[in-house]
Amino acid sequence: HKMATNTKEYWFVGDPDQTIFEFAGASAETFYELSKGAEDLEQGYRCGQTINNLCKQIIKPIWDHYNIRRTWKPANYRKGHEKEGQLIIGNHYYLPNYTTDCSHLRILLDKIRNTEETFLFTYRGNPSDTFVKNFFDQHGIEYAHVGNTAHVPKKELRCHKLWPEFANGKPMSLKQIKEFWDYLGSKVIVHGKGEYEFKDWIKKDYTIHELIKLKLLKETSVNEKDFRLIRVQKGKKEDYEKRLIYIEKVLRKGFNLEGDVRVRYANIHTVKGLTFDNVIVDLTRTRPENYFEQLRLKYVAYSRGRYDCWTIPSQSTYTLGIK
């Protein structure tokens, strides 16, 4: 209203169906009124046909209530994709929970491990965040919370993977050696050298034998092949041991030494506006909520995805999107 009063010409651009911050003062009713008669941008650029149809089905009661009719066409594959310009179809899969083995779970795990696609796990709130983190830990999946660094940094994983090769004599870059130093303890580092900064070192590869000769590493370092046994424990023992178990699972399953983490998780309010290749939606809801607010949350959750989506039914009394 302030904008309309003080400005002769103004533009409203947005999607009232994604009004999910009512608790912060957003008014869905106002946005739907503003959208009446607005130009409809018909072509979608994110969701494939399956997710597009699902989202339309989810939001239909609201469209009917406000007498809204939108075209919203499904997206095509982007430039550079092997199917560039073709309609994205996609699939909708179902998981009973995060722990039961089934064909659709195996499809998800296979896609995570054997493609370069991105995955978003999203949910309404607690306890779903615990469910999803336990799932990642169980299957040795690299993951990060949306907007944060990885649960275990790439450099930490690299140290566990590359140390045995370094101990066997393989030369490593100065960068990698500095990363080792961030974790190594007194079992291999010479006393007083734990804070060594490698100033003025030439950026090239070095062997473990060179570091031993320079009195930085102990001679017995070459016999230590397991990084878990020579690194410094950080945090509570129980948490540290769980971290090591998780790291071993990641190494066993295989991971990309470089690049971004492709699997992320967050609640629905956090992921609004983001795009991922695939989306996994947990419909658990633990308290009564306004029906239309539920539908908008569910709509936002699924519409983050391009290709495939997975649905996990509520593990509680209430289901997101059900009165």
Regions found by a protein language model. Give the residues of each.
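The feature marks helicase ATPase cores and/or their adjacent C-terminal helical subdomains
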Residues: 1-323
